[in-house]
Amino acid sequence: MGPPKIGQTVVVEVPSTTANIGPGFDCLGAALDLSNQFTIKRIEGNAERFELIMESTEGNHLRGGPENLFYRAAQRVWRTAGIEPVALEARVKLAVPPARGLGSSATAIVAGLVGANALAGYPLPKEKLLELAIDIEGHPDNVVPSLIGGLCVTAKTASDRWRVVRCDWDKSIKAVVAIPSIRLSTSEARRVMPENIPVNDAVINLGALTLLLQGLRTGNEDLITDGMHDKLHEPYRWGLIKGGLEVREAAKAAGALGCAISGAGPSILALCKATKGREVSVAMVKAWEAAGVASRAPLMSLQLTGSECISNTFG
């Protein structure tokens, strides 16, 4: 079979994500309304050629080539669909900063899957793309909401299948995400976690996750506050984030219902009513400034559509 004849250039938008949201370690994540845009183009050359063009200084350290996450994801689509690969160029308008706990790696994986699938004429269903995304990333909490949008719980069943459930999020609840200038890699954040956890800590998290999901569904402030409590990963990770605990306490004092490390960090998520958004944002930025860390703290909403192919040029 020759190269795909349908697509020449596709433009894909992929949202950022906040994962874990406190007690939902490696299973809970939400898509947010901050997105990366990927313009993906077939180019001349052998199938191993991949050119990456970053339209942001934040991504200057990222490189093309066979180890790039986008490239690996695109290749998985070709192989799975039985299609001969083609050389690609990806031009990225980067709005989601890397190594900040906002799912930047997930956006690359999802863009590679969705873009390659679109170029090939959509041979794979979204369910298969979900499976591939989780396999490449290694955990589902970022890639799943990045692909399908919304607030998602992803669990592995007794039959070793992934099951995804989209949960309700009351519109009155907003997310303030304090994004610092410092970086923290996911691998570093995972290294500090213990291999085993006490049963009591697991029980606390199970209860907290139930409270949080019910609070987000109904907009119940007390349930959100009681539910944003974690024993599995945050106690080990706060020490990696300079000024993080002070930022958390400042957000709560300003009216946040609860705070959590966003993904692996170092960004910090605060949930609040929309009327408290500005106060919480200002408080978090000031607290980080006092610790000698520059930051910004935009007020964000849930992104419901997930990744979208907004343009497909046929050639």
Swiss-Prot record:
Pfam families: GHMP_kinases_C (PF08544), GHMP_kinases_N (PF00288)
GO cellular component labels: cytoplasm
Keyword DNA-binding: no
Disulfide bonds: none
Reaction(s) catalysed by this chain's protein: L-homoserine + ATP = O-phospho-L-homoserine + ADP + H(+)
Pathway(s) of this molecule: Amino-acid biosynthesis; L-threonine biosynthesis; L-threonine from L-aspartate: step 4/5
Family annotation (PROSITE patterns): GHMP_KINASES_ATP
Coarse class of the protein's main subcellular location: cytoplasm
Enzyme class: transferase
Molecular function in Gene Ontology: ATP binding; homoserine kinase activity
UniProt entry keywords in alphabetical sequence: Amino-acid biosynthesis, ATP-binding, Cytoplasm, Kinase, Nucleotide-binding, Threonine biosynthesis, Transferase
Compartment(s) of residence: Cytoplasm
Residues in coiled coil: none
GO biological process annotation, one example: threonine biosynthetic process
EC numbers on record: 2.7.1.39
Annotated binding of ATP, by residue: P97, P98, A99, R100, G101, L102, G103, S104, S105, A106, T107
Role this protein plays: Catalyzes the ATP-dependent phosphorylation of L-homoserine to L-homoserine phosphate.
Record-stated family: Belongs to the GHMP kinase family. Homoserine kinase subfamily.
Protein name: Homoserine kinase
